[in-house]
Every structure is written in C-alpha cells, then in structure tokens.
Amino acid sequence: MKKILFAAIAILIGTTATAQQPDAVYKLLRYEWTVNADGTTDYHYRHEVQILRNRALVAYADKGETFVVYNPDIEELTVNEVYTIQKDGTRVNMPQNAFVYQLPEECADCGRFNHLRELAMVHTGMELGCTIVVDYTIHRKHNTLNARIPLWRECPVETLEAVVNYDDGMNLSYAIDGSQNLQMDDKDVTRSESINTDNNSRVLHYTFKNLQQAPREPYMPADYIPVLRIFNGTPQFNTPEGDQTFTEASDAMGKVQGKGGVKEQVSAMRNYVVDNIHLNDINPSHLGYTVASPAVTWNTGCGTAADKAALLAAILVNEGYRAFVSGENMDMVSVIIDTLEYRLSIRSKAPIQLYGEAHDEVATLKADNSPEANFDTLEDGFYSLSLAPLAGEPAVRARSLALTRTTPLQSGACDLAQTDTYILPKGMKLMGGVNDKLSFDGVGSMQVSIKQSGNKLKVVRKLKLEKSLVPVSDYANYRKLIAAWQSHGSVMLRMKEMK
C-alpha cells in the first residue's frame, strides 16, 4: 500500500513539475520601426524561440509555423532570414517550398479583403531544444505608428526590445499599461532616448529582460496583461462621407429592439450587429487605417472591427441616439444615455459599461413569474426541474475555476431576485424542499428556496455580487458562492401523486 501511495505522490510531483515547465522560450523578440521623412514606415521584426517540449509543436502548432499578414497594395514584405539551429549547432535553412502564400484566415468570408496575403513559413529541422529564427521587414506606404506589444506571452521571454527611429520633429508617445502587474526588478527594464544632431533624428529604445509567461486563467481582465504602447498620435481613420444618412438597417432594428429600457434596446441593436455582420479581425495598419462606409459593411455582411463600430454608430444615430466610434483601436461604440457615456463592444455581447469614473455597473432584476410547469419525469417518483439562468447573471462557470488563482477575476456585479410560481397537477406533493443560503462579506450572497403551498410550487432565487472585478484575496469565497449558486441550476425534486 505504501509503495502505491509513494508512486502516486511521485506521479503527482512529476505532473506538477511538468505542468509548470514552459513549452518554449523566446530568447529574443525584437520590434523596430523607422518612420521615414517621405511618409512611409519600415517595420523590422525578429524572433528567436527555443522549443522545449513537444506541445509547442503538437498541441499548439504555432512554433512550427510562422504567419505574416500583409497588403500588397500598400505593403512590401521582405524575408531577411529564416532558419533553425539544431541542438548540435547545425543551421538548417528553410527551402523555398516551405514558403506558402495564401489568403489570411481573418479575411475569409469577405470578398473585399481578398487582396490581402499571408505568408506561411513552415519551419524545417525541428527537434526538441532547437531554436527557430525569423527575421523580416515590411515597408508600409503610411507613417502612422500605433503599436501595442504584449509584455507577457504564451511562454517566457528572455529579452524583448522595441526600437523606434524617427524625425526629431515628430511627436512620439509611449506608455506601459498594466505596469503594476510586471513585478520586475528595475535592472530588467531599461529605456533610452538618443538624438543624432547630424540628421535631426531620434531613437527610442526599450529593453525588457526575463519576462514571465502569461497566466492561463479563465475570466482574466482584458487589460491585466502589461502592454507597451508606442504611437505617434491617434490613428486618423479615413471614413467615407455620408455616414450620418445611413437608413438601410431601420427595418431590421425596429424588429430587434423590443421591450426594455434604453440600455436594453441599444444592447439589442449591438447584438444584431455582432450576430449578423461577420468580423474580419484585420490589423487596421494593413488597410492604411481606412473604414468602409456603413452601407458597404451592411450590404456585404462583413467588415473589420472599425467597420462594424462605424456601422453600429450610424445605426444608433439614425435611431435618434447620440453615438460615436471610440476605443484606441476604433472597436468600441459610445452612446450617451442620461448625460452619461456608455460603451459597447462590437466584438462580443459583453454588457454595456459606464465609461469614465471607476464604477461597478450593477445588473439588477426584480421579477415575479408564473412559468408553465414542465417537469421531466424520472424513475421512482422523481421529477427534474431545470431553472433558467437569471437575466444579468455573470457568465462565469464554477466548474472552470481552479482552487487557487493568481490574477483578478472579471465577473460582473449584480443584484438579482426572481420568484417563479408553478401550478402543480392535482394531488402532486413535494417531498422535502430546498432552503440554501450563503453569504460572504465584501463578496456577495445567494439564496435558493423551493417550497410548496397547496397546488403551488414557489421557487425563490436571489444572487448578489458586490464587485465586477474580484481580487485574489476574495477569490476563494467567490468560488464557493458561485459553486453553491450554480449547484441549483437543475433541481431534482421528489414528488408523489397523492390519491
């Protein structure tokens, strides 16, 4: 018995150690931009990644191939070098037949993007411990710089560099969003700026050492991962004239708004755009920061994030709202409701959010319903009653939450209360019932009560979550609360027909 126990412990330790080992490591990630005086930009990219485990090639299949998207109309791609260094130091150059030109996946289902190209580089000489080197340059016929470089990747990074060469008269801005999450020594982050008086040019040079692997935890806030932003002004998206006269979606919008308040109606129109206009998630730099007219996006049924945002804004304006495109990448829509600015994502059906001051937008529900009693009959006098999720209930699923966590959890604040009263068949009696309560200070509370009175079955459900963003210190109690709440999603009732 002891041998079996020791073996199990050894397996557990081995599994834990393996799980913590990264699949690969970036020895170098380097980004360099040269903003030229003639209004063009040269983007130079290089990475050197070492393969540590088969998963980097098999499970993810991303380190065995490199994909580069570009627009031949305004961009020229030059591959400088691509090769593999094997464990014994042998250099394996990539043969010409390993370079495959194809339509980018993000351009599928939208004919007006068929001119974009993707170069797929299928790496050769692959083995555990090898290092893949990729180096290429893209010459762009515009000088807009709007770079966002995530500082945490799917595997650790030993050295990350970001370099910008630009004219002394250009206004260049830079910042690290989420810098408080980096937890790095000062010696591992350096920034230098130099001036060349001979040609009136400047150089910005960031260097990061020993960047950690990005956490792989569900429901992590989108802005939690640190990002280096470098930009030379807000991108000026070129939008065709006539956007404010767009009326082609009026009939469709009249059918989807339905009942509810202003926020519900606005959200319904956004949901229609999310569901019915295909998103082609193309970096706007490949399109020269141009935006299609709402009519083009509507009639083709597809578009970039900026295209969809412009369409939704035009729809809302036509419906009488004050709305406009917003967000750093023009992928949000702002709408003014009661003098307050709310924002909607066009990428998902995420709840409408109040913009500006720190604020937990609380989803509220107070409802009394009389639904039809549709019980599933089971064996031995059991019946099953499935309870539908409450409107405003967070999408977090308890079964996907680990015992511990290292990052905050994006949930959603709510204050929900719903009573459902079912009329039971004559003579049907509930054997037992449910009365479950749980509460944690600073986190929230839940209550589920199921009891019978005469021929009525009364189901009372209440859920209150106090914070949209759950800190790590509250995670354990939050997990218990959500698990208890979702355990009542499908209720097993023992009922007996009384003669």
Briefly describe each language-model feature range.
Residues 20-499:
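A sensor for short, sequence-defined functional sites
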Residues 4-13, 312:
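Sec-dependent N-terminal signal peptides
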Residues 15-19:
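Sec/Tat signal peptide C-region and signal peptidase I cleavage site
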